[in-house]
């Protein structure tokens, strides 16, 4: 009798192990890809790396856009990606929250029925991700975790608070963890070595899109794109930023020349943007763009905590300011106290001569 009980126990044990393998261990992180319908943006590669820290079984990537097939193909080659879901529809060209959200919610809600449950949904903490992810979290009735900078385990994450002056460790017990990833905190996933299968979801996604369009009457009106030969601000190796000390927008040409000499991008503090010196797409900081270049040159920037929150992870920080007590010098690796209108042209000329 005892032997039989042992045999039954072993049998049940194997069944339980199989059930665990089939249910608990088949967990998926769904990464929502940021792209321009032609190319995958680096922010998605950083987000995939964050997803790889979770210990989930699968990393699936949703590519939603218009004529975005080439993007889906490139994602399938990214190391660590196991599945690619592609939804191609003209309305998705601009990733409107009203049209992309139902697709994500449907993917998550139907995943548990298929035994491969989506336990995490990650997307870059950019304007792209911030636009729709709060809707996703609300519809799934879960709390969103914003600006994830470290994945400790599948339930525990770190994120900056108080303009980056403190790091909060948060634990989520939600069935599905929904979060935006601060891309500067993670390396880019290798763009080769993967062989994921690309699956079209148009058959069930298109009706959802058309329903969303009819119910919200949403449509894209227009966009204004500024062409620049300089690298994109968030991915530039070198960033030269100016603050209120630049005095006017015309003086930013001085920084543009320095940035071009170094092959970098031009940024600005909120004070410079609010003063009308430059457009807000150049703003670096808590309410602007988060950057972490190899070299960050802050010119005429005092160093408000909101600005520091957007650039303090830069590898090398150089500050040029005439005020020796400026807070920016507290985080700078190299500081130059002097008149920027004298020092910046000298620096630019010296770099040109050294080339």
From Swiss-Prot:
Family listed: Belongs to the ETF alpha-subunit/FixB family.
Gene coding for it: etfa
Location(s) in or outside the cell: Mitochondrion matrix
Keyword RNA-binding: no
Annotated protein name in UniProt: Electron transfer flavoprotein subunit alpha, mitochondrial
Annotated residues for binding of FAD: 295-323
Family annotation (Pfam families): ETF, ETF_alpha
Task performed by this protein: The electron transfer flavoprotein serves as a specific electron acceptor for several dehydrogenases, including five acyl-CoA dehydrogenases, glutaryl-CoA and sarcosine dehydrogenase. It transfers the electrons to the main mitochondrial respiratory chain via ETF-ubiquinone oxidoreductase (ETF dehydrogenase).
Cofactor dependency: FAD
Cited Gene3D superfamilies: HUPs, TPP-binding domain
Comment on bound cofactor: Binds 1 FAD per dimer.
Quaternary structure, from the entry: Heterodimer of an alpha and a beta subunit.
GO molecular function terms noted in the UniProt entry: electron transfer activity; flavin adenine dinucleotide binding
UniProt keywords, alphabetically: Electron transport, FAD, Flavoprotein, Mitochondrion, Transit peptide, Transport
GO cellular component terms, semicolon-separated: mitochondrial matrix; mitochondrion
GO process annotations (BP): fatty acid beta-oxidation using acyl-CoA dehydrogenase
Classification via CDD domains: ETF_alpha
Recorded superkingdom: Eukaryota
PANTHER family: ELECTRON TRANSFER FLAVOPROTEIN ALPHA (PTHR43153), ELECTRON TRANSFER FLAVOPROTEIN SUBUNIT ALPHA, MITOCHONDRIAL (PTHR43153:SF1)
């Amino acid at each position: 009798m005892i032997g039989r009980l042992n045999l039954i126990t072993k049998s049940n044990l194997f069944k339980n192990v199989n059930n665990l393998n089939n249910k608990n261990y088949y967990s998926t992180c769904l990464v929502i890809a940021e792209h321009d319908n032609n190319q995958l943006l680096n922010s998605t590669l950083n987000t995939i790396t964050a997803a790889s820290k979770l210990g989930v079984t699968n990393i699936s990537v949703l590519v939603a856009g218009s004529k975005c097939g080439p993007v889906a193909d490139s994602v399938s080659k990214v190391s660590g990606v196991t599945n690619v879901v592609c939804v191609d529809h003209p309305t998705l060209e601009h990733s409107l929250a009203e049209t992309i959200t139902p697709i994500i919610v449907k993917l998550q809600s139907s995943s548990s029925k298929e035994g491969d449950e989506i336990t995490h949904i990650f997307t870059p903490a950019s304007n792209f991700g911030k636009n729709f992810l709060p809707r996703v979290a609300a519809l799934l009735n879960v709390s969103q975790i914003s600006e994830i900078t470290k994945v400790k385990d599948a339930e525990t994450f770190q994120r900056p608070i108080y303009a980056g002056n403190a790091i909060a460790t948060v634990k989520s017990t939600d069935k599905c963890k929904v979060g935006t990833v601060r891309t500067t905190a993670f390396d880019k996933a290798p763009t080769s070595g993967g062989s994921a299968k690309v699956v079209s979801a148009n058959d069930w996604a298109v009706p959802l899109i058309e329903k969303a369009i009819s119910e919200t009457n949403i449509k894209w009106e227009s966009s204004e794109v500024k062409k620049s030969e300089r690298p994109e601000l968030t991915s530039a190796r070198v960033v030269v930023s100016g603050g209120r000390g630049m005095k006017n927008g015309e003086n930013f040409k001085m920084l543009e020349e320095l940035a071009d000499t170094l092959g970098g991008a031009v940024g600005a503090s909120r004070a410079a943007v609010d003063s009308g010196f430059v457009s807000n797409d150049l703003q670096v900081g808590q309410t602007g763009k988060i950057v972490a270049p190899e070299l960050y040159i802050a010119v005429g920037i005092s160093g408000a905590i909101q600005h520091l929150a957007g650039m303090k992870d830069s590898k090398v920080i150089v500050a040029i300011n005439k005020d020796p007590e400026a807070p920016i010098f507290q985080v700078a690796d190299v500081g130059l106290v002097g008149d920027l209108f004298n020092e910046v042209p000298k620096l630019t000329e010296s770099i040109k001569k050294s080339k």
